[in-house]
Amino acid sequence: EDKIKEYLKKNGNDFAGALRLIPLKTRKLFVHSYQSFLFNKISDEFLKIHRGYNKIKNIKIPIIGFDFEAGYINDNKLKNIIKKTINEEKISPRDFIISQMPELTSEGNFRDLFFELKGLKILEISEDELNQDKKKAKINFTLPKSCYATTAIEFIFQ
């Protein structure tokens, strides 16, 4: 943080130069985190619409990037959720083309809405010292690449 402040004092409004002081992996993490936020927001809305159905087929949800086009989406409800999310966030898929830092440009992808949780084990259940009259659980499981444990845990404990 101090290096960035110093850089900006010396170089005025060269924000791209200041951001380049942050390691590349960390800068990419910022972009990918925002894409994951969008994915989760879209997924949550899709599941709210389909709540109460006995069975929802697994579909692919987009990870919004510069090459995303709504025309690739066959499900009209999903298409509307994506458009609504993009409008609410005041973004365009083209915003993921970062001309001042092309190394951060992200094309996006698709990810399954549902994934298989393998080897789920409850290792321990005990009193929660932070939340009176509550229990805590220590669990273990394996997820496929690009799936988030937080999402799986939220689903398990709903």
Language-model segments: residues:
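Non-catalytic, substrate/partner-engaging modules appended to enzymatic cores
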Residues: E1-Q158
